[in-house]
């Protein structure tokens, strides 16, 4: 990617745009507009007391619960894993790991195991179904799940044991086709939370932590991206930076598994 393309891609991110200062009057106008949108699209901001109570209860004693889960899950806590998200992300629901082996690549995509904590017969489940998704507005987020849950036990924060669903893929070194696919429940321990800009800096700095891992991830992701284009896939953003390419291609590969 050229320096001009990199600059253009970076300018489109929250990190590249920098902070914006507004007056108190403008802040009030934004709040009023936000409330109008909530009413127009029937978006609920506050959670019912029962949902909040369930969320608090599910975050009690989670470390002991995770230890108990090790008996029934793959223990991947020693596997290097990391998350890459926007600078303003509040929950980290996916992480990746990658390794080059003699006979190809091995890629892991880890997804936070939300369903372990949110069951179909719970008030949290009913509320999540009603909301449908998390709504992101400028400087404001309306969560699908209570932040007590979404930003703690359901978030793959660094240096904490977390429950996950893992897609482990062995890829052919030439065609990048699947040699093996294994999907299982796991316990992981993310090594670091990166922003997209931090990922770019790690790629540029050979001495930075996770440089080798991110470089390998981009090498693989770039090849998968080019392969998709050759296969006729629609590419909406050809100037996407390396960090976004890594996450996008790894998630697409996991979705195909």
Predicted regions and their residues:
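Electropositive polyanion-binding surfaces
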Residues: 2-40, 50-257
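Acidic, low-complexity central loop/insert segments
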Residues: 44-48
């Amino acid at each position: 990617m050229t320096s001009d393309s990199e600059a253009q891609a970076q300018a489109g991110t929250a990190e590249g745009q920098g902070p914006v200062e507004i007056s108190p009057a403008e802040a009030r106008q934004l709040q009023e507009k936000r409330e109008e949108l909530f009413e127009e699209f029937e978006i609920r901001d506050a959670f019912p007391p029962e949902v909040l109570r369930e969320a608090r209860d599910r975050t009690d004693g989670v470390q002991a619960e995770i230890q108990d889960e090790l008996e029934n899950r793959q223990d991947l806590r020693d596997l290097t894993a990391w998350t890459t998200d926007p600078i303003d992300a509040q929950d980290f629901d996916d992480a990746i790991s990658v390794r080059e082996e003699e006979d190809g690549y091995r890629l892991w995509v880890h997804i936070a195991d939300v369903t372990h904590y949110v069951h179909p017969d719970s008030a949290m489940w009913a509320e999540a179904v009603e909301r449908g998704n998390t709504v992101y507005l400028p400087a404001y987020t309306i969560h699908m799940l209570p932040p007590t849950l979404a930003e703690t036990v359901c978030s793959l924060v660094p240096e904490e044991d977390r429950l996950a669903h893992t897609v482990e893929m062995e890829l052919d070194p030439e065609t990048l086709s699947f040699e093996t696919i294994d999907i299982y429940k796991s316990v992981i321990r993310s090594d670091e939370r990166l922003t997209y800009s931090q990922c770019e800096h790690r790629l540029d700095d050979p001495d930075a932590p996770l440089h080798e891992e991110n470089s390998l991830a981009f090498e693989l992701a770039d090849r998968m991206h080019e392969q998709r284009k050759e296969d006729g896939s629609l590419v909406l953003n050809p100037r996407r930076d390396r960090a976004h390419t890594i996450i996008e291609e790894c998630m697409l590969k996991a979705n195909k598994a």
